[in-house]
Amino acid sequence: VYIEPWNSDIEAFMDLRLNQGDEEARCRDLFSALWIPDLFMERVQEGGKWSLFSPDDTKDLPELYGDAFKEAYERYEKEGKATKTMDAHVLWQRILRSQVETGTPYMLYKDPCNEKSNQKNLGTIKCSNLCTEIVEYTDKDETAVCNLASIALPKFVNPKTKKFNYQSLIDVSRTVTRNLNKVIDRNFYPTEPARKSNMRHRPIGIGVQGLADTYILMDMAFDSEEARALNHKIFEAIYYGSVLESMEEAKKYGAYETFEGSPASKGILQFDMWEPSKYPLTLNWDALKEDVKTHGMRNSLLLAPMPTASTSQILGNNECIEPYTSNMYLRRTLAGEFVVINKHLIKELISLGIWNNETKNAIIRDNGSVQNLVIPDELKAKYKTVWEMSQKVLIDQAADRGRFVCQSQSLNLFLEDPNTSKISSMHMYAWKQGLKTGMYYLRTRPKARAVQFTVDPATSLEAAKAACSLENKDECTMCSA
């Protein structure tokens, strides 16, 4: 359920998933998300007041964003229509406390989601999906649908030269785009509004899996400048290939029905809607933009990096865009449980001649960390877990790739010892970077861990599995692609 923070039900909404309190006011199986206008973040930042309204009295607010929303909101404040006025910081703290306790609500920013959308000519987008990567227009006559696929990035790394094959990635992105168009045409639609939406706007969502594995294969630490630059080039290549193929499909079959009036119809692509990046574009975008203006595109939306919680296990990749959470752990999904061991680490430790029971027990004892092993510093950097790196790294990389992501991305954030101050800083930074999804889940580590009574391999592995499974509650497999 998505709600905007001006809604008079917001305070009760924040309590729905809490562990304590009135059971009649709890709904812990409901996934909660905020659809946040920039005005709220500005009021929090400046220490201002925040007004709550009944949706019955302010029926146009859900339809507005940007300056139009601000003008209407402030007019309703002056007219005295607020049901309650409070310090914006008070509501903000309530949101943060809920995230400390439950990992939710998800944080999505209404203005960037609309202002940076190729569907902005259709109307106002009012929500995302369960995994926060789909941002599509929907109304009473149309149910937004997306057609997903993920690309296994490690397949494009040459194991001998440790070079990345960008041209091959462009070619595969074109193939995926072509195939997803066939899915749209041949799919079974359970409802007419779903079929109507999919056929009119033809959105697709291309994501990735194994980004962390790709960095490792190329001898890069996740939090290195080289990895950040690679991330930018990878997503530029995927976006280029998908735009190119969507244009070629439009040549054959015609542009999607609502293409005219979209940003793309005017030669405006996703990266044109963002602030300039520190990294230059490397592909021939000018010529492609002219082709798009001439021939159109077959799809309104193209990229949407999703969680890949289950499908990444098929090829043994780390999921989606995330760092490794541990070098040895149990991954629990709705489809079952998977013991995950970092295969790249084992290979390197074997080559150094130090992979043995003692090393394995040391990794288990340190909850999947290698920072206390006697190994070269470059290996310690390369095999850092997400708990051992700044979350600014994840946000920066999300913003860099966001310039090529025309929907949004499932961006989890991780804090070993969360508090409201740290979370507030992360949210403010993500918002200022222009992200559409500021946070999917806030992942934390359990306070209690299995006591390591023994270094016996079997016993300690079971203990580690039990401890690590606490960190990986049931994952959503709907967006596995």
What does each model-found stretch correspond to?
Residues 2-9, 35-37, 56-63, 109-122, ...:
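A glycine-rich phosphate-binding loop feature that marks nucleotide/adenosyl-phosphate handling sites
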Residues 15-42, 228-233, 322-341:
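Catalytic or ion-translocation cores adjacent to nucleophile or general acid/base/metal-coordination motifs
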Residues 21-26, 74-81, 152-167, 189-199, ...:
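Glycine- and acidic
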Residues 98-198, 203, 208-218, 317-344, ...:
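Function-dense linear segments that define catalytic or interfacial modules
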Residues 172-195, 199, 203, 221-308, ...:
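Internal maturation/activation junctions in enzymes
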Residues 452-481:
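Acidic, low-complexity intrinsically disordered tails
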